Amino acid sequence: MKPGKYLFRVLFLTVILFTTFQNLSYADGGFPVRPGRLLISPSVSYFFANSEWDSTGVKKPFPNGGKFSSIGVTLYTEYGISRRFAFVATLPYVYNNYSLATAPSSGLTDLETGIRYYLANINFVYYFSLQGTAITPLYTNNASLGYGEEGAELKLAFSGSGHLFGESSYFNLADGVRQYFGTDGPIQNRFNGTFGLSLDKKFMNQISVTLSGINSFSNNKSFSPIPQTDKDFSFLQASIGYGHSFSHEVSLFLSGGQFLTGRNTGVGTTASLALYLQA
């Protein structure tokens, strides 16, 4: 794989890490990992909100001046099984703090494991992939960490590379449907689109922009400032990212985002720092 395409894929993989607090999947990349190669990406993320969009989309402060913040530490891994298949896994840990709650909460949340199948490619420039993911809660009797329900997701992604303003570029589009299997378990449509651009001929520095969101539907319409617990909501988020590659095996990425609009969700501001390692 050419260095440019390789680093574009890495940038897309890590630039969306900041979305962990709304449980957006890490495994959206469309460019394949070589057979026998292992990708490891630890990250630290931050989420903050002190206002919300209500069920009609009207923005207002949290009651009684409440504030919610969350710090997450996540390990993402991806292993190339063959030219067509890859194994992916995500293990997140969060520390949640709502100012009006009696005490913060922390712990492992939902383990995600999946298989990605590369359906086809066009001249090794454009790639189509399909991924199935299983969601397994790693906690019990702690509603502040998530739904506590098993689930499954099916996601389709389309990725490609090219040139813009004389510089190498790439894009990725992904859309997935996720179902949780418990009481009032929501069904969700999760989507994102990313465009990235290299800033130099050696592919050492890159920037990207991303639009992402979730539409979640459930009979449970209640709202909580803790976003992992809401079941019926929607939001659209914009983010920018910067990546620096020290080598083909080691890269560092920064990203930040802002929720633009939503329903029954907090008005979130996000940031993340991620390290990419390949063996």
Q: What is each stretch, according to the model?
A:
Residues 22-59, 64-65:
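Outer-membrane beta-barrel biogenesis signature
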Residues 36-38, 43-44, 48, 147-225, ...:
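Detector for outer-membrane/organellar transmembrane beta-barrel domains
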Residues 42-44, 75-79, 89, 113-117, ...:
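Residues on the lipid-exposed face of transmembrane beta-strands in outer-membrane beta-barrel proteins
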Residues 44-50, 91-97, 119, 134-138, ...:
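Transmembrane beta-strands of outer-membrane beta-barrel pores
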Residues 50, 84-89, 122-126, 163-171, ...:
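Repeated loop/turn-to-beta-strand initiation elements of outer-membrane beta-barrel proteins
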Residues 53-55, 61-63, 195-279:
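Outer membrane beta-barrel transmembrane domains
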Residues 65-98, 110, 186-188, 197-200:
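Glycine- and aromatic-enriched membrane insertion/assembly motifs of diderm outer-membrane
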Residues 95-188, 230:
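Outer-membrane pore/translocation modules
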